[in-house]
């Protein structure tokens, strides 16, 4: 494939946009550099770039797209609402309707508030938990990404009883000292951290199924034990379901796993491709948010009618029978084919799959926690990424990310993808 126009536009972009991208994950730095492909439009499972190349898309905007690009039902809903106005600054019927549909799908959301991003949603749940418990410290799990607010850009200390350090310039040490980071799926480390800091902890922040170092499921009993220990110390459990809500079934991962938090942050999929975030949970906790309580959260664009209408339309598509069963079937077809090719070419790799989402890791370890992904073969992934891109398969340019299937992918797309993998693996020996 030729990417002449993408390369030209990237040079132009560098003149005006810092680093040439509006989010660092869009650069190709993690896969050896080069100009990222500039896309012009998307339809269904496909993206089309400025050079006229067509791609089967498994990036799907890092997770928000589950019904394919430019889904006609969602597109029409957005167009109809845009004709009526995109922002009023007042309450609307749409936000009531959307909240009702969300609570019907995720019963733990006794009360709901909308914001504009997953970062805002997580940031606010932390503030609410602190207001409710009158404590300051937070526990998070290594490798889980919870947005770019100061409190969650914190690296692990040298052990479970050690406080964190800033994971980004501009995050004060004083902020990092309010955060403890422990390994996911390691209940003993969590026990140790709570034993040391539990009386000061406001909440633990958990991805119930991890989506930010690939797709990683909790070990049996892990989430249940986290809930038990957390509540024993009077702290709250916050689930970050920004990636997982409506990804695996019509509802949240908590319902699938039958383990429930006190508060939930959500976003991505529920906006139908438009900017959105939200949070909700137990009524007695949520009542600490203004205007009923002292914890402040506001937003000019929060609950805007365009995002609300898109979200309603998205749920109308997903609530149809058979949607998630088909995603699971496609995911299994892709996984089975990848495993067969790994064996055929003697590639050192493993796969984690959760329904219609999976990650291919270049390691022989079964992935259960972040350090294993950190130590996986990044050079092999970078080579694989470029080989796939040049065959028209669009993946995330990072060994930490998942492949996302949509309602618009077909068996033929999977088969074409596997042909590309077959060739890529043949060039990696």
Curated annotation (Swiss-Prot):
A Pfam match: Aminotran_3
Modified residues (N6-(pyridoxal phosphate)lysine): 268
Reaction equation(s) it catalyzes: (S)-4-amino-5-oxopentanoate = 5-aminolevulinate
EC number(s) reported in the record: 5.4.3.8
Cofactor: pyridoxal 5'-phosphate
Superkingdom of this protein's organism: Bacteria
Molecular function per GO: glutamate-1-semialdehyde 2,1-aminomutase activity; pyridoxal phosphate binding; transaminase activity
UniProt KW keywords: Cytoplasm, Isomerase, Porphyrin biosynthesis, Pyridoxal phosphate
GO biological process, one term: protoporphyrinogen IX biosynthetic process
GO cellular component term, pick one: cytoplasm
Database matches in CDD domains: OAT_like
InterPro entries documented for this protein: 4pyrrol_synth_GluAld_NH2Trfase, Aminotrans_3, Aminotrans_3_PPA_site, PyrdxlP-dep_Trfase, PyrdxlP-dep_Trfase_major, PyrdxlP-dep_Trfase_small
Recorded metabolic or biological pathway in which this protein acts: Porphyrin-containing compound metabolism; protoporphyrin-IX biosynthesis; 5-aminolevulinate from L-glutamyl-tRNA(Glu): step 2/2
UniProt subcellular location: Cytoplasm
Principal cellular location given in the protein's record: cytoplasm
Gene3D superfamilies referenced in this protein's UniProt entry, alphabetically: Aspartate Aminotransferase, domain 1, Type I PLP-dependent aspartate aminotransferase-like (Major domain)
Similarity remark: Belongs to the class-III pyridoxal-phosphate-dependent aminotransferase family. HemL subfamily.
Subunit structure comment from the entry: Homodimer.
Stated name of the protein: Glutamate-1-semialdehyde 2,1-aminomutase 1
Species of the source: Staphylococcus haemolyticus (strain JCSC1435)
Organism classification: Bacteria, Bacillati, Bacillota, Bacilli, Bacillales
Record gene name: hemL1
